[in-house]
């Protein structure tokens, strides 16, 4: 496939991520190509400037269309302005302080203003949507999580069905709910589904404004969301939400969250797009096992690991960005502590970080290669699971297939595995560049397991 940045797989992937939203109004092809022409490979400053300029231009077009009464043009331009603004701040790097320091990272001072601008522009687009969108405030511990409930237009309700099935869409490590729109919220309401999104701990405005850190036990977060949704549905019976047809979904780290959330018996279906099985295994995948063993056994100090990763990150922007992002999510500045904290994010059931000598967690098994203590054995609902054959981050065998094999409590007929091998068919991480196809696969699965019946379309020519 064509490479926008042949020398930077990271910048290339993130460009496809932006361009891929064009099918749902998040980008325009020529605008993206114009921005690409102004960006230097692995140069965060030129990336920020190019997308900031495109956001400004799209916002000006949106205001012109709004003044002229052109609803569709205004909506699409506000979407692009919001998405380009999000992209402009994507390469910001938090300050981790001194090597191996214990103080939480200091986020780039531009990060919060950009996040607020993204939300402001996106809300203008929401006001011009065909279907109703409701703003929610979801209690979760001491913090209220901002959410959005996308409802199908009356004419798009599923024929013959009294109530509306609900898909709860969970964001991932670097997501905000404004970007989540370009997958399920962009397609679900038109198919008769309500779609709920929210910024949870470590995500979007909740992270940037309130500093709420990520947590591994996302089933607790989703449980709070479902509690709220049940109460909200009871308070608003006219919405006709079907509390017996709730599905959860997510991509990448959101796919991990979705699988953890699927243990809640209120969840009747789960869609997990390109999840990791174990974050520690992901984080150490390209490091020598001997080095990891020497470190975790104390032969090599954490201070040495910190110094080594700091030096490498000065030479490799992608690593610098990844360490800063993960440190911001965890509230940690030491690269070694960031890596060790990844052990808590696992589906193996070993969230106590007890793996000895840094060995990969492929055992113990039940004798057939399936981890007998897997958290996934608690899942009972049907699951649609995908992997990405050309992922920049995750190996299919180390993550996707382990997730599939770990679903021992789900009958084979209720598990679907989709692992495309070409980019056009969805082989990039989180199905970037193939969002419409991901929607098609997802809602076909949900229709099947939630009992949604659709009449085949008549495409015979009547012209």
Curated annotation (Swiss-Prot):
Domain of life: Eukaryota
Annotated region (Disordered), positions in chain: 350-373
Ribosomal protein is among the record's keywords: no
Alphabetically ordered keywords of this record: Hydrolase
Pathway: Mycotoxin biosynthesis
Record Pfam families: Abhydrolase_6 (PF12697)
Subunit text: Homodimer.
Family to which this protein belongs: Belongs to the AB hydrolase superfamily. FUS2 hydrolase family.
Function of the protein: Hydrolyase; part of the gene cluster that mediates the biosynthesis of the mycotoxin pyrichalasin H, a tyrosine-derived cytochalasan that inhibits the growth of rice seedlings, but also inhibits lymphocyte capping and actin polymerization and alters cell morphology. Pyrichalasin H is indicated as the responsible agent for the genus-specific pathogenicity of M.grisea toward crabgrass. The first step in the pathway is catalyzed by the O-methyltransferase pyiA which methylates free tyrosine to generate the precursor O-methyltyrosine.
Matching PANTHER family: ALPHA_BETA HYDROLASE PSOB, DIENELACTONE HYDROLASE DOMAIN-CONTAINING PROTEIN-RELATED
Name of the protein described by the UniProt record: Hydrolase pyiE
Source organism: Pyricularia grisea (Crabgrass-specific blast fungus)
């Amino acid at each position: 496939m064509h490479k926008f940045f042949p020398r930077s797989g990271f910048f290339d992937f993130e460009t496809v991520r932006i361009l891929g939203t064009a099918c749902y109004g998040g980008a325009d092809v020529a605008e993206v190509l114009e921005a690409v022409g102004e960006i230097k490979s692995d140069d965060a400053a030129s990336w920020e400037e190019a997308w900031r300029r495109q956001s400004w231009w799209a916002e000006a077009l949106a205001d012109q269309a709004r003044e002229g009464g052109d609803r569709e043009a205004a909506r699409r331009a506000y979407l692009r302005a919001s998405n380009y603004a999000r992209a402009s701040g994507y390469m910001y790097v938090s300050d981790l302080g001194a090597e191996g320091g214990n103080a939480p990272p200091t986020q780039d001072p531009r990060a919060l203003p950009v996040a607020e601008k993204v939300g402001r522009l996106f809300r203008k687009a929401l006001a011009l949507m065909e279907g109703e969108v409701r703003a929610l405030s979801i209690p979760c511990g001491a913090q209220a999580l901002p959410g959005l409930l996308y409802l199908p237009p009356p004419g798009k309700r599923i024929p013959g069905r009294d109530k509306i099935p609900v898909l709860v869409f969970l964001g991932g490590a670097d997501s905000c709910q404004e970007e989540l729109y370009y997958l399920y919220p962009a397609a679900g309401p038109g198919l008769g589904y309500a779609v709920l999104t929210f910024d949870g701990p470590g995500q979007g405005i909740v992270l940037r404004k309130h500093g709420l850190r990520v947590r591994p036990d996302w089933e607790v977060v989703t449980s709070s969301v479902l509690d709220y949704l049940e109460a909200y549905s009871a308070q608003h019976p006219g919405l006709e939400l079907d509390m017996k047809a709730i599905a959860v979904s997510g991509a990448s780290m959101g796919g991990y969250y979705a699988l953890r959330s699927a243990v809640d018996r209120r969840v009747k279906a789960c869609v997990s797009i390109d999840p990791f099985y174990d974050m520690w295994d992901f984080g150490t995948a390209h490091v020598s096992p001997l080095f990891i063993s020497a470190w975790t056994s104390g032969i090599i100090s954490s201070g040495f690991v910190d110094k080594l990763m700091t030096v490498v990150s000065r030479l490799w922007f992608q690593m610098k960005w990844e360490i800063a992002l993960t440190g911001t999510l965890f509230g940690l500045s030491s690269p070694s502590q960031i890596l060790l904290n990844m052990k808590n994010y696992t589906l193996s059931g070993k969230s106590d970080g007890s793996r000895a000598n840094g060995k990969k967690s492929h055992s113990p098994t039940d004798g057939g290669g399936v981890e007998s203590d897997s958290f996934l054995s608690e899942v009972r609902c049907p699951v649609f699971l995908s992997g990405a054959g050309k992922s920049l981050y995750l190996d299919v065998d180390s993550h996707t297939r382990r997730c599939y094999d770990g679903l021992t409590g789900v009958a084979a007929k209720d598990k679907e595995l989709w692992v495309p091998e070409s980019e056009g068919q969805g082989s990039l991480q989180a199905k970037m560049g193939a969002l419409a196809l991901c929607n098609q696969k997802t809602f076909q699965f949900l229709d099947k397991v939630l009992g949604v019946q659709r009449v085949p379309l008549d495409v015979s020519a009547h012209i």
